[in-house]
Amino acid sequence: MTDIKQILTDLIGFPSITPEDAGCQKYMIQFLEQLGFTCQQLNNGPVSNFFACYGKIGPLLVFAGHTDVVPVGEVSKWDTDPFSLEEKSGVLYGRGVADMKGSLACMLHMARRFIKTYPSFPGRLGFLITSGEEGDEFNLGTPYVMQKLEQQGIVIDYCIVGEPSSSLKAGDVIKIGRRGSLSAKIHLSGKQGHVAYPHLADNPIHRISPVLAELTSMQWDNGNAFFPPTSMQITYIHCGGHAGNIIPGELNLHLNFRYSTEQTDESLKTRVINAFTHHNLNPAIEWRLNGEPFLTNKGILLESCKQTVLEHIGTLPELSTSGGTSDGRFIAPYGVEVIELGLVNATIHQVNECTSLQDLNTLETMYFSICEKLLID
């Protein structure tokens, strides 16, 4: 029988740089169909997606994840071939071993073991997998699949996202939510001119400066028990001109909010627009909502996960909402209890990305135990 390490070896061998799947999902679908899962591919443009389900009735527990990985960077800086799993003293190296093909290997191995142990369990076990998580095509992935499932009347009760949530060892941190992300591209027009004749020009840098001073000093909220205060960061400023004696005629500015449940995207938009209005400016603003904040601070799923972690590593997990966004933001709005439980994130997106064989085994065992608590007990 194929063990976790062999499954991970197979998955790492697919060079699935986002949004390419490169054969990962074909492998996973064949694996799951052999167990009796019904699989449907829901590909969308360059992004590969599939949903798989075992069982007909009862609560539906879905394991969600992504097969795509970030680029490897300079291959010469790796100590190993990034697309060939290599073990050194119990540590496994390869692009995606932690984020998140290691979790996928644990999910597959667990599913086979669970179905063999409980072939007629009173519930349903599912997989929601995309190759569009790491790049700009995320809207073609999980949110698209969720729309399709809603159209089919498929309701998910619980979802475990296999993102690398842990800090020092598998299970020590569970993500119970994530901040929202809102971006803005702002264009302010002025009038180009010579610096010696400012009265004949209109400098957009000068005009926007008091607005930026106001926005960067603003206390958006105080956060709450689960989230830090909302933050805003300016990520890009560019002006025309490109010469020391030219007043630029236009300005482009990008900013991003990471916001708590104390805010909505509309409340943030209003405050930004009001700041510009206060200074008699009316720029063109293009907004992009990357994801709303979500929080699972109670419920059967969270309690089952907390108890499972305590049983397997001897301590309760830290419950956190830190870090960037995840695809959980597209699943939670459908009323699903969502948590993230995965491997250690210390080396994700880095050269020599790695995880330990011990953590893989621990995570697989925890996934199995959670399934028992939710679908058997």
Curated annotation (Swiss-Prot):
Catalytic EC class: hydrolase
User: Where, by residue number, does Zn(2+) 2 bind?
Assistant: 99, 134, 349
Reading the lineage from the top rank, the first entry is Bacteria
Pathway, per record: Amino-acid biosynthesis; L-lysine biosynthesis via DAP pathway; LL-2,6-diaminopimelate from (S)-tetrahydrodipicolinate (succinylase route): step 3/3
| Annotated Pfam families | M20_dimer, Peptidase_M20
Q: Which residues are catalytic?
A: 68, 133 (proton acceptor)
What EC number(s) does this enzyme carry? 3.5.1.18
Give a GO biological-process term: lysine biosynthetic process via diaminopimelate
Positions binding Zn(2+) 1 in this chain are 66, 99, 163
Q: Which prosthetic group or cofactor does it need?
A: Zn(2+); Co(2+)
User: Has UniProt tagged this entry with the keyword Metal-binding?
Assistant: yes
Cofactor binding remark: Binds 2 Zn(2+) or Co(2+) ions per subunit.
Oligomeric form and interacting partners: Homodimer.
The record's NCBIfam families line, in alphabetical order, gives:
dapE_proteo, PRK13009.1
What does the similarity note say? Belongs to the peptidase M20A family. DapE subfamily.
Protein's recorded name: Succinyl-diaminopimelate desuccinylase
What is the gene name? dapE
